[in-house]
Amino acid sequence: MGLLSILRKLKSAPDQEVRILLLGLDNAGKTTLLKQLASEDISHITPTQGFNIKSVQSQGFKLNVWDIGGQRKIRPYWRNYFENTDILIYVIDSADRKRFEETGQELAELLEEEKLSCVPVLIFANKQDLLTAAPASEIAEGLNLHTIRDRVWQIQSCSALTGEGVQDGMNWVCKNVNAKKK
């Protein structure tokens, strides 16, 4: 087999599909993050009623991202989307300190879910462009992330608005797609 035929075969190989669940409290920036990933306009975003799905190509993967609304009345329905999740991305509004306890509680409950057991989790400490944003290290400490032992995890500072840190987080996602512990 010549080099050209090997290259053709590699080029025609289908991307590995990855199911990503994008969760977090309302107003954390999930939809802005999703639109930033898809290189879409982020100037007119309204609260998500239900869910959005987008497919994004990245590093040989087809990332199917499910963005589920974070309003309190929608959260009980999150579990309907757990099945076959490869990566969980949890978005936190780093500037909304009064909701850290609530967001920490929701994240802890997600990490206890059987259908999400061992699923790698990326926590985006979003809105780092705001002066009042808590650093990712402070959030990690406050949420006791260091106690997570049953899966690979990462906390990533980002600003969905400016795009800063988003690609770093997605690089981690692509590196850890197959890290789901059995």
From Swiss-Prot:
Matching Pfam families: Arf
Gene Ontology terms: cellular component: centrosome; cilium; cytoplasmic microtubule; Golgi apparatus; Golgi membrane; midbody; nucleus; photoreceptor connecting cilium
A GO term, aspect molecular function: microtubule binding
Main location group: Golgi
Annotated positions of the Phosphoserine modification: 5
GO term, biological process aspect, one: photoreceptor cell development
Residue positions binding GTP: 24-31, 48, 67-71, 126-129, 159-161
PROSITE patterns, sorted: ARF
Lipidation (N-myristoyl glycine): 2
Subunit record text: Found in a complex with ARL3, RP2 and UNC119 (or UNC119B); RP2 induces hydrolysis of GTP ARL3 in the complex, leading to the release of UNC119 (or UNC119B). Interacts with RP2; interaction is direct and stimulated with the activated GTP-bound form of ARL3. Interacts with SYS1. Interacts with ARL2BP; the GTP-bound form interacts with ARL2BP. Microtubule-associated protein. Does not interact with TBCC. Interacts with RP2. Interacts with PDE6D; the interaction occurs specifically with the GTP-bound form of ARL3.
NCBIfam families for the chain: small_GTP (TIGR00231)
Protein name, UniProt field: ADP-ribosylation factor-like protein 3
Species per Swiss-Prot/TrEMBL record: Sus scrofa (Pig)
Lineage: Eukaryota, Metazoa, Chordata, Craniata, Vertebrata
